[in-house]
A protein has these predicted regions:
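Nucleic acid-binding interface residues in structured DNA/RNA-binding domains
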Residues: 2-114
C-alpha cells in the first residue's frame, strides 16, 4: 500500500469537522469543496471532502447542498444535481448556464487560510 503524504493527511479529516463547518454556511450562500479543505488545514483534500459529504447522514439539516465546485457548477449530491440546484434556488441562489451567478458574492470565506 502506498502511504504518501496526501493520503495520510486526507485520512486525518474527521466527518464531524466537515459537518460542523457546513453549519457555518448560511442559507443563500455557498462554499466549495476546496474552501472546506483549506479551512480544515488541508488544501489537497477536496476529493475527501466530497466523499464525506456523500455520506452525510442528514443532508438537509447539515446543508451539504451549499457546497459547489470551484468553477461555480453545482457538483454532485446524494439526491441528484438537479435536486441540489432546486434547494439552492429555494435559498435565493441563481444560476446562469449551470453556474452560480454572482459566485464571488455568494461564496462564503470559511477561514483565513484561503
Amino acid at each position: 500500500m502506498n502511504y504518501n503524504s496526501k493520503n495520510l493527511s486526507e485520512s486525518m479529516i474527521k466527518n464531524s469537522d466537515v459537518y460542523d463547518l457546513l453549519l457555518k454556511i448560511p442559507a443563500g450562500k455557498v462554499s466549495t469543496y476546496g474552501d472546506l479543505a483549506k479551512a480544515l488545514g488541508n488544501p489537497l483534500a477536496s476529493q475527501e471532502i466530497g466523499r464525506i459529504l456523500g455520506k452525510n447522514p442528514n443532508p438537509i439539516k447539515v446543508p451539504c447542498h451549499r457546497v459547489v465546485m470551484s468553477n461555480g457548477k453545482v457538483g454532485g449530491y446524494r439526491y441528484g444535481s438537479e435536486r441540489k440546484r432546486e434547494l439552492l434556488e429555494k435559498e435565493g441562489i441563481s444560476f446562469i448556464n449551470g453556474v452560480v451567478s454572482d459566485f464571488k458574492k455568494v461564496r462564503v470565506n470559511l477561514s483565513s487560510k484561503q
